[in-house]
Amino acid sequence: MNNLFPFLALNKIALQLGPLAIHWYAIFIVGGAALAVWLACKEAPKRNIKTDDIIDFVLFAFPLGIVGARLYYVIFQWSYYSQHPSQIIAMWDGGGAIYGSLIAGAIVLFVFSYYRMIHPLDLLDITIPGVFLAQAMGRWGNFVNQEAYGKIVSNLDWLPAFIRNQMFIDGHYRMPTFLFESIGTLSGFILVMVFRHRIKGLKRGDIFSFYLVWYGAVRFIVEGMRTDSLMLGPARVSQWLSVLLVIVGLVLFIYRRMKKN
């Protein structure tokens, strides 16, 4: 049956401590990052990388990744933020882009790898499982903020009531595209964790290549269903970037097998 109480949406604030408001969005982001660090620290010794290097990398990459996510979003919504500059830093209300975070994180990773004399593909292979998991969790922050949704649908009877309630936006039920992407990235995480030490012949960078192809494909499909995509003219920016990710992932995978040394 249809949800009889669509107004029972979740509060964006999880906990209020006097003037300090702790948002669900922040909890999912920080929680995902913490799990990603834990996973990377467990894997690092197997690649002869110190856990201290992982911690140091995260201390640089995490804050700059958040800045990158926000900056990317603001750039493509400049028509709004140019008129409301005070809202530029209000990320607690939502408004971050995963691709912006990935771009910033990649820059930090390559610079960090150079100065610590760590092969960047080793560091990427170590961190990718955590990135998958953090992305899967982060989409639930979008869920609470009522972001990353799709077209209007007549009902969502196939979903639990708490999701139906939150997907009732502006008087209509919306397709929960956040959920599709969360499931897609969680599936990628499970596949990597199950097979990365079971498949013989994996080369340095293969896990990273898999991430680029898998996430690029998932994001391309999901982005096509969203109605709040960041646009550049008539084009969905994230779909173009998704195609680029798939191409780079395939090229890297093939190149690593053609390279003799």
From Swiss-Prot:
Its EC number is 2.5.1.145. Its main location: membrane. GO terms for molecular function: phosphatidylglycerol-prolipoprotein diacylglyceryl transferase activity. GO terms for cellular component: plasma membrane. HAMAP family: Lgt (MF_01147). Catalyzes the transfer of the diacylglyceryl group from phosphatidylglycerol to the sulfhydryl group of the N-terminal cysteine of a prolipoprotein, the first step in the formation of mature lipoproteins. This is Phosphatidylglycerol--prolipoprotein diacylglyceryl transferase.
